[in-house]
């Protein structure tokens, strides 16, 4: 928790100035809101330059500025392509060298074919001039055809080694980058995370590392092969006749100029796209992790629009990126075709001049054709390399950052025997993320060894800052913290944190079992290496001490129960007790309790507090508490106000002083009307408690009878109910099994995303067809050129004339290709980025449409869904944009080329076409294998990404437990598992890819052998032969290129199926459904009629067992009872987060399941136990309470005044325009809660639901806010869940829950007189002076 110092007593003139300033700025247009949203996120994610930081911190003294800069500065890493391989091992580099050589050798195979071609051309001329016999000709032809076969076999082996090798090394290196990035993240100081959203970490560790992997894997091999082909071709050309080769080499210069000029813009656009997606990922992570809040307030539309702000920015830069690549590719094709024309023109002059012969010219021209064509294959890969460099820059900037407070460092001393005396000496503290606010000023405090020191005071006064400084989450700007007289800066940080156990206000559990969560408390302690049996005993003992053992054993799987992501499957109190058990299991020297019992009910709190009191003995304990009943026995109570110590002493001393502490006590004092209880009465009450546990529960006020008339029948009913509900829930789960979709269905589904671009997409298809037809046309020109150069010396005049004509035709073809390729690139850039934008936007909206049960499923964790949004949408573009255009283009090339070949020489064409089905079969089989591989790989990476996201979003808990090494071991284990699984799939798919590429040589061998025979017999002339061979070469190559897109298509198919499943999933409780009655007005009668409920993820665990409850209009009722008894579940059912298994919830006599869910929820407002704020300004967060934008400032101000937050907001430099940070990280818990209350009040609800609404507030704020809530409750039906009983003593009826039933009800006074369960709870919270 990051606290901000408040100034509640702002003078009137200061407030009026703020009011005059703020409304104008806060009444913003949509574009202004987008700017604020962008600002809020960009502030959180951009690398801060030293100049930026100096400007932000200019008002501070130099030494303070330096301390804050160390905690904030993020270096702006300049990545080059070489830096992507920085984590390659020696073995990786050796392997890379081998596979690079294989790629280069594979690339040299095609130019070697031109040597054979030139030789055969000479042989053809010889037989035409009758210089050799037909048998000699046939022998030479057969031998050269066999050379083609040998070349094909060699290329198959070389390509296979290259593809498998590069994919393996790429995955291996990327695996290390993922691990290094997470390792670097876990070593950062907490100030770094105040600037960084957990969603950005997920985006970096999934989408960005995938981009790096894409840029260093098989695309490197393909590029090396293409470059090798290019250079080999030109080397052969220079050897044959250097003058012509030199002239044709101008191609290289032109291409380098084009690529160099455009790639600068490509890299910048790629970087900006990644930044925008990172910011969007942070918003998505915030929203999904707080989905209950978004659902309760119906803010899905507003939050989706906030997400779209960043998607639009990413779309803008993405379009620029794709357009530049399209223009670059078009320019390169134009240069290539122009070069053909230049070659023919100059070649004809050299031939006529007698400087060279036909064989050399044919060899050189064909080498130039192949070499120039191959360079075209490099262009599509440059985008992958550029994206990899951009992604690398973002990732390496974090990896290279030297943390100011590094938990992974071995530096620093240790103290052999820690006594535990803590001293804060002259402390001044400023949070790095909010440098304009001083949180602590001149704090001097000694915490004696073995004593308990309590810190109390208003929210934001600096209490939790004490914990942050002692744990070294932050460094103070001046002063020092000492442990046993040693400045903690000189101590080893990991060792220091292992001496301290922390239980924080919002308990964080990890997505594993209860046993493993408690075991985490043993990290770094001597007990960590004990036997499993001893560890088990310690864990059970700690759970018993924390009053957690009984509820754990009540769970079906006991200690082996998985708690879900962040412990969502447990109630707040249950999570808190497990966190306490985790803290005390290692018997620490220093215990920090930051609101450690805030989430517990009074009964649990009493037991746990006794356990904590016992655990505190003999160790140094610092307790931060708002609930003063928990700290009255402390050895020293320190009252902190405004970042300074106001007073300190024992409970009695401070009460006698009649100062600030007494005011806090009075604010929280419960008005009990009872006499002193004798010791005998206490014994009697204990006996009553025991008898109550085995007898019939107390009468329910509303039912008029005992809920369970017969105990045996009741037990039987529960058993039956369990079976029935388990069947119902298992049926619901089975209905959600993965649906399989046909390829056609998925293609239609993806095409739907580009529906608005249909017309321009048709234009794109038109240009793609024109581009594709270019190569077969070039084949005609090429054959005509060869035929022209074959003319005898007597026709040299005609030769020069024809050569000029065909050279000009090549130039014209180049210009046409420039236009068509560039136009195609621009059009598909628009379509592709629009598809990605809509896919992300609609899938995010589809997620927000789902009911809460969807998010409870383990596979739908925040990390998994955020990763899905960032990664799978990118995969979806594998069948759109540049990929789709290229596939259509090469398909056209294949069809037109084969058609032309059939038209001019059907015999030779048919023989060559017979090989095409084999190529298609290889390609499609590879496509199918990759689709299967992608499905498996995606799940593995989702799992590891989800785990990384969970760890980073709980960084304070990870840091305080020194769990960094454990997190890394699990994460690296997940990555290793995925690498092993992928290798076999890669081996299969690469086999087929190599086959599909090398088959073109076998096709050429067959074509030359059969076509040469036809030529030798005189059936075909030179034009027919060269045309058919040229068409088949490029046609079959085009088929191979189509299948090089198989990985992208495989990913797209898998992603499309996931999207279709998400879009097709219609939730049971559907916010988009128009069905159900809409309520215009509501009186506010709420009824529960025999409600039974179990959570869908835990069908064997009953939560509510026949609940009957009636709340009359305008009535204020309170729900109290032990943790896990069903109080918060009751609130969830009123909100209709879930539907009941049996029975019903009614409003004004109408079953809420038959009402329109949006209309119904519009009459409710919820304030939860853990407040949720989103990226953006304070004003934006308050306005999330209403579904319209035209809310006057006065209404916003009124809601904030009612929630006692207005004065604090106006004291901030930017007032209502203050950016709250990721998840409200810039504010303290109390400040966040009051903004959440303001958000509820601006809604003006008829039914107000308060789930621990004031649990995060100090006594002073609580009193004012409670009064505001009491006033707000007038005329409204209010249901309040409370552990702190002082907040609900004025309730009209208080219902005491136990095990899903009401066991007692009445007013505060009636229940006190009954001296039952409620009476005990009140007694435990008594704030009377200790005797």
From Swiss-Prot:
Instruction: State one Pfam family annotation.
Output: ABC_membrane
Instruction: Kindly list every residue the record annotates as glycosylated.
Output: 293, 529, 860, 1108
Q: Which GO terms describe its molecular function?
A: ABC-type oligopeptide transporter activity; ATP binding; ATP hydrolysis activity
Q: What induces it?
A: Expression is induced upon exposure to a wide range of unrelated cytotoxic compounds, including acriflavine, benomyl, ethidium bromide, ketoconazole, chloramphenicol, griseofulvin, fluconazole, imazalil, itraconazole, methotrexate, 4-nitroquinoline N-oxide, tioconazolethe, or the allylamine terbinafine. Expression in up-regulated in the presence of keratin.
**Compositionally biased intervals (Basic and acidic residues):** 1-20, 31-41
Residue span, ABC transmembrane type-1 domain:
97-387, 764-1051
| Positions annotated to bind ATP | 457-464, 1121-1128
Lineage, top-rank taxon, reads Eukaryota
Boundaries of every ABC transporter domain copy:
422-667, 1086-1324
Enumerate the subcellular locations listed in this protein's record, separating them with semicolons.
Answer: Cell membrane
Query: What Gene3D superfamilies would the database entry show?
Result: ABC transporter type 1, transmembrane domain (1.20.1560.10), P-loop containing nucleotide triphosphate hydrolases (3.40.50.300)
**UniProt-annotated stretches for the region Disordered:** 1-51
Summarize what gene deletion causes.
Answer: Leads to increased sensitivity to terbinafine, 4-nitroquinoline N-oxide, and ethidium bromide. Leads to a reduction in infecting activity, characterized by low growth on human nails. Impairs the MDR4 induction when the fungus is challenged with amphotericin B or terbinafine.
Reaction(s) this enzyme catalyzes, per UniProt? itraconazole(in) + ATP + H2O = itraconazole(out) + ADP + phosphate + H(+)
Q: Name one GO cellular component term.
A: plasma membrane
Q: Report the transmembrane regions from the record.
A: 93-113, 147-167, 219-239, 242-262, 325-345, 358-378, 762-782, 810-830, 884-904, 910-930, 995-1015, 1025-1045
Keywords assigned by UniProt, alphabetized:
ATP-binding, Cell membrane, Glycoprotein, Membrane, Nucleotide-binding, Repeat, Transmembrane, Transmembrane helix, Transport
In the UniProt record, the signal sequence range is none
- Free-text function comment from the UniProt entry: Pleiotropic ABC efflux transporter that may be involved in the modulation susceptibility to a wide range of unrelated cytotoxic compounds, including terbinafine, 4-nitroquinoline N-oxide, and ethidium bromide. May play a role in pathogenicity.
Q: Which family does it belong to?
A: Belongs to the ABC transporter superfamily. ABCB family. Multidrug resistance exporter (TC 3.A.1.201) subfamily.
- Please report the name of this protein according to its UniProt entry: ABC multidrug transporter MDR2
To which species is this protein native? Trichophyton interdigitale (strain MR816)
Query: Which gene holds the coding sequence for this protein?
Result: MDR2
């Amino acid at each position: 928790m990051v606290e901000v110092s408040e100034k509640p007593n702002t003078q009137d003139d200061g407030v009026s100035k703020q009011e005059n300033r703020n409304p104008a700025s806060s009444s913003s247009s949509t574009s202004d809101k987008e700017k604020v949203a962008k600002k809020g996120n960009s502030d959180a994610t951009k690398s801060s330059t030293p100049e930026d930081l100096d400007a932000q911190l200019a008002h501070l003294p130099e030494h303070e500025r330096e301390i804050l800069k160390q905690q904030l500065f993020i270096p702006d890493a300049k990545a080059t392509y070489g830096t992507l391989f920085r984590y390659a091992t020696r073995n990786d580099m050796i392997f890379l060298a081998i596979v690079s050589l294989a790629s280069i050798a594979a690339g040299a195979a095609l130019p070697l074919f031109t040597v054979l071609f030139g030789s055969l051309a000479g042989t053809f001329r010889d037989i035409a001039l009758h210089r050799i016999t037909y048998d000699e000709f046939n022998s030479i032809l057969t031998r050269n055809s066999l050379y083609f076969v040998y070349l094909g076999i060699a290329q198959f082996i070389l390509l296979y080694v290259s593809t498998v090798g590069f994919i393996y090394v790429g995955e291996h290196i990327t695996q290390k980058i993922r691990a290094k990035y997470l390792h670097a993240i876990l070593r950062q100081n907490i100030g770094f995370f105040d600037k960084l959203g957990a969603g950005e970490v997920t985006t970096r560790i999934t989408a960005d590392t995938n981009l790096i992997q894409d840029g260093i894997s098989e695309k490197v091999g393909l590029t090396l092969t293409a470059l090798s082909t290019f250079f080999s071709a030109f080397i052969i050309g220079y050897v044959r006749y250097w003058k012509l080769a030199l002239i044709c080499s101008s191609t290289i210069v032109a291409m380098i100029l084009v690529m160099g000029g455009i790639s600068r813009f490509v890299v910048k656009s790629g970087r900006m796209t990644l930044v925008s997606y990172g910011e969007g990922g942070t918003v998505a992570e915030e929203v999904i992790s707080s989905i209950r809040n978004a659902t309760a307030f119906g803010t899905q539309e507003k939050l989706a629009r906030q997400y779209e702000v960043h998607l639009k920015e990413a779309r803008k830069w993405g379009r620029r990126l794709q357009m530049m690549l399209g223009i670059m590719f078009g320019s390169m094709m134009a240069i290539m075709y122009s070069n053909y024309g230049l070659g023919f023109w100059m070649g004809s002059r050299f031939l006529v001049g007698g400087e060279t012969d036909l064989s050399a010219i044919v060899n050189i021209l064909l080498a130039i054709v192949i070499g120039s064509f191959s360079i075209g294959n490099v262009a599509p890969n440059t985008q992958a390399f550029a994206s990899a460099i951009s992604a690398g820059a973002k990732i390496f900037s974090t990896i290279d950052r030297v943390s100011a407070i590094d938990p992974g460092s071995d530096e620093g001393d240790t103290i052999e025997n820690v006594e535990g005396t803590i001293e804060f000496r002259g402390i001044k503290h400023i949070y790095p993320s909010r440098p304009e606010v001083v949180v602590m000023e001149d704090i001097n405090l000694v915490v004696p060894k073995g004593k308990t020191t309590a810190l109390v005071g208003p929210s934001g006064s600096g209490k939790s800052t004490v914990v942050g400084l002692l744990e070294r989450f932050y460094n103070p700007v001046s002063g020092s913290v000492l442990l046993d007289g040693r400045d903690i800066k000189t101590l080893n940080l990991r060792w220091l944190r292992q001496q301290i156990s922390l239980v924080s206000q919002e308990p964080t559990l990890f997505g594993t079992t209860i046993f493993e969560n408690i075991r985490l408390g043993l990290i770094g302690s001597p007990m960590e290496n004990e036997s499993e049996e001893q560890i088990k005993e310690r864990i059970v003992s700690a759970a018993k001490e924390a009053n957690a053992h009984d509820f754990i054993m009540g769970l079906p799987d006991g200690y082996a129960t998985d708690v879900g992501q962040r412990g969502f499957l447990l109630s707040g109190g249950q999570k808190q007790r497990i966190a306490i058990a985790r803290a005390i299991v290692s018997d620490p020297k220093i215990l920090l309790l930051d609101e450690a019992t805030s989430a517990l009910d009074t009964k649990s709190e009493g037991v746990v507090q006794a356990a904590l009191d016992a655990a505190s003995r003999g160790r140094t304990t610092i307790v931060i508490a708002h609930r003063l009943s928990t700290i009255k026995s402390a050895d020293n109570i320190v009252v902190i106000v405004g970042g300074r110590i106001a007073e300190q002493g024992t409970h009695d001393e401070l009460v006698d002083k009649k100062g600030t502490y007494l005011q806090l006590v009075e604010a929280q004092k419960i008005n009990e009307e009872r006499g002193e209880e004798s010791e005998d009465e206490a014994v009697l009450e204990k006996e009553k408690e025991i008898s109550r546990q085995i007898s019939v529960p107390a009468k329910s006020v509303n039912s008029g009878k005992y809920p369970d008339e017969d105990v045996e029948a009741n037990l039987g009913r529960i058993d039956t109910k369990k079976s029935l509900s388990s069947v119902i829930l298992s049926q619901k789960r089975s209905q959600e099994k993965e649906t399989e979709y046909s390829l056609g269905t998925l293609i239609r589904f993806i095409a739907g995303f580009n529906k608005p671009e249909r017309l321009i997409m048709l234009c794109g298809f038109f240009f793609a067809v024109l581009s594709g037809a270019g190569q077969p046309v070039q084949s005609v020109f090429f054959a005509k050129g060869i035929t022209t150069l074959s003319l005898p010396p007597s026709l040299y005049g005609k030769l020069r004339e024809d050569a000029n004509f065909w050279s000009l035709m090549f130039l014209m073809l180049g210009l046409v290709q420039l236009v068509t390729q560039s136009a195609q690139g621009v059009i598909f850039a628009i379509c592709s980025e629009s598809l990605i934008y809509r896919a992300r936007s609609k899938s995010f909206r589809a997620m927000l449409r789902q009911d809460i049960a969807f998010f409870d499923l383990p596979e739908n964790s925040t990390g998994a869904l955020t990763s899905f949004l960032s990664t799978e949408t990118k995969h979806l573009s594998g069948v759109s944009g540049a990929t789709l255009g290229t596939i259509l283009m090469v398909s056209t090339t294949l069809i037109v080329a084969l058609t032309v070949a059939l038209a001019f020489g059907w015999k030779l064409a048919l023989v060559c076409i017979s090989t095409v089905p084999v190529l298609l079969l290889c390609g499609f089989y590879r496509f199918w294998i990759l689709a299967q591989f992608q499905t498996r790989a995606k799940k593995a990476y989702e799992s590891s990404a989800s785990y990384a996201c969970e760890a980073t979003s709980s960084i304070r808990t990870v840091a305080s437990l020194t769990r960094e090494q454990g997190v890394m071991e699990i994460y690296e284990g997940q990555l290793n598992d995925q690498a092993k699984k992928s290798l076999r799939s890669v081996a299969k798919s690469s086999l087929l890819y190599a086959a599909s590429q090398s088959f073109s040589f076998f096709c050429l061998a067959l074509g030359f052998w059969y076509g040469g025979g036809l030529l030798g017999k005189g059936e075909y002339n030179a034009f027919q032969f060269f045309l058919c061979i040229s068409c088949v070469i490029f046609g079959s190559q085009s088929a191979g290129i189509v299948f090089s897109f198989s990985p992208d298509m495989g990913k797209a198919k898998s992603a499309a199926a996931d999207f279709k499943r998400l879009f097709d999933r219609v939730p049971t409780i559907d916010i988009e459904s128009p069905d159900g009655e809409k309520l215009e007005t509501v009186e506010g009668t709420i009824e529960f009629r025999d409600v039974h409920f179990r959570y869908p993820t835990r069908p064997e665990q009953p939560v509510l067992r026949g609940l009957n409850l009636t709340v009359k209009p305008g009535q204020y009722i309170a729900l109290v009872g032990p943790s896990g008894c069903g109080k918060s579940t009751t609130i969830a059912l009123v909100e209709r987060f879930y539907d009941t298994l049996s029975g019903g919830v009614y409003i004004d006599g109408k079953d809420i399941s038959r009402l329109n869910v949006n209309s119904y929820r519009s009459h409710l407002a919820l304030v939860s136990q853990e407040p949720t704020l989103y990226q953006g300004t304070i004003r934006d967060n308050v306005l999330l309470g209403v579904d319209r934008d035209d809310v006057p400032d006065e209404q916003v101000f009124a809601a904030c005044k009612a929630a006692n937050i207005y004065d604090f907001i106006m004291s901030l430099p930017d007032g209502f325009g203050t950016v709250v940070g990721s998840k409200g990280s810039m504010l303290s818990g109390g400040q966040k809660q009051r903004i959440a209350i303001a958000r509820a009040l601006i809604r003006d609800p008829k039914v107000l639901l308060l789930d621990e609404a004031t649990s995060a507030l100090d006594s002073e704020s609580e009193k004012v806010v409670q009064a505001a809530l009491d006033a707000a409750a007038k005329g409204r039906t209010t249901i309040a869940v409370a552990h702190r009983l002082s907040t609900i003593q004025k309730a009209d009826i208080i219902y005491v829950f136990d095990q899903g039933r009401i066991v007692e009800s009445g007013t505060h006074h009636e229940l006190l007189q009954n001296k039952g369960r409620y009476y005990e709870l009140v007694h435990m919270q008594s704030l009377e002076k200790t005797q």
